[in-house]
Design a protein with these regions (language model features):
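Conserved ABC ATPase "signature" region
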Residues: 119, 123, 130-148, 200
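Conserved ABC transporter NBD signature motif
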Residues: 83-94
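Conserved signature/switch motifs of ABC ATPase nucleotide-binding domains
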Residues: 151-154, 172
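Hydrophobic anchor residue at the start of the ABC signature
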Residues: 166
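Helix-to-loop junction immediately C-terminal to a conserved catalytic motif
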Residues: 75
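Catalytic Walker B motif of ABC-type/P-loop ATPase nucleotide-binding domains
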Residues: 177-180
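Short coil-to-helix segment of the ABC ATPase nucleotide-binding domain corresponding to the Q-loop/switch region
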Residues: 112-120
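Signature (C-motif/LSGGQ) region and adjacent switch/coupling loops
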Residues: 36, 95, 115, 149-152
């Protein structure tokens, strides 16, 4: 495990163009009182491009520290004050189909069926109806919802709604998937199931994922690498490599290797005096 104070090249494979590279990112906004608030300050991080296996990186930090702000900038939903965001070496200048985002809140269209929700992005791209239906059903099958293709969102549980959101994102085959605390509103049992589902589905798709959470256990269970952020304004304080890559299941959370990394993060966060704002785990 490594923990540099600044991570300008952390996670890059030697000689390869990183999937994501952020250089000296600064983001501010004006609050309701008219005061300028610095949300992100000099963030540098790199997520490797690992063809054939994918990569899952986690932004871990206290609530309100700027994690979601960074994600929105990568997605192109907001413009940074300064700095550079590169996807596969190309600068981000706005939204695009190369990035897909899954939010914590449920974002399905209530009047469309589950299948029609998943088809929505393909419909905007002008994909023929028969092909849209085929692809949507394939991804619904992957997330275990093929039998609910003709249901409406109001008939689904919270976990099922998030599965719809995941299928709707992946069917567009983005180069990078951005996930903003997608399981934060779920009960513990559903949350565990969704964590396992994410690992299974995303590995099959060879996706690069940037996942935001303030749950330490979730971060260690999901991540190949973890970027620890400070209080607002967000800075990258440490980067942790998670040394195991296979057989990630609920039993792993009781293993010595898992507990060692979890405790290491707890000690780190305690030393930064942010533990009170970070969830220890479920």
């Amino acid at each position: 495990m490594s923990e540099p104070d600044k991570a300008p090249a952390a996670g890059a494979l030697q000689g390869a163009v990183p999937k994501l590279e952020i250089q000296d990112l600064f983001i501010s906004y004006v609050d309701r009182a008219g005061k300028v608030v610095q949300a992100v300050e000099g963030v540098n991080l790199t997520v490797a491009n690992k063809p054939g296996v994918g990569e899952l990186a986690v932004l871990l930090g206290p609530s309100g520290c700027g994690k979601s702000t960074i994600l929105k900038a990568i997605c192109g939903l907001l413009q940074p004050d300064s700095g550079t965001i590169l996807i596969d070496g190309q600068p981000v200048s706005g939204t695009g189909r190369d990035r897909g985002m899954v939010f914590q809140s449920y974002t399905s269209f209530a009047w469309r069926t589950v299948r029609k929700n998943v088809e929505y992005g393909l419909e905007l791209q002008g994909v023929p109806a028969a092909q849209r239906q085929k692809q949507a059903l394939e991804f619904l099958d992957q997330v275990g919802l093929k039998d609910f293709a003709d249901a409406h969102p109001k008939q689904l549980s919270g976990g099922m709604k998030q599965r719809v959101a995941i299928a709707r994102t992946l069917v567009n085959k983005p180069r990078m998937v951005l996930m903003d605390e997608p399981f934060g509103a779920l009960d513990p049992q559903t949350r565990w199931g969704m964590q396992s589902l994410i690992l299974d589905v995303l590995r099959k798709q060879d996706n690069t994922v940037l996942f935001v959470t303030h749950d330490i256990s979730e971060a260690v269970f999901l991540a190949d690498s973890i970027f620890v952020l400070s209080h607002r304004p967000a800075k990258v304080l440490h980067r942790i490599e998670v040394p195991y890559f296979e057989d990630r299941n609920v039993a792993l959370k009781q293993s010595q290797a898992f507990k060692q990394i979890e405790n290491h993060l707890l000690d780190m966060l305690q030393s930064l005096e942010v533990r009170g704002n970070v969830r220890v785990g479920l």
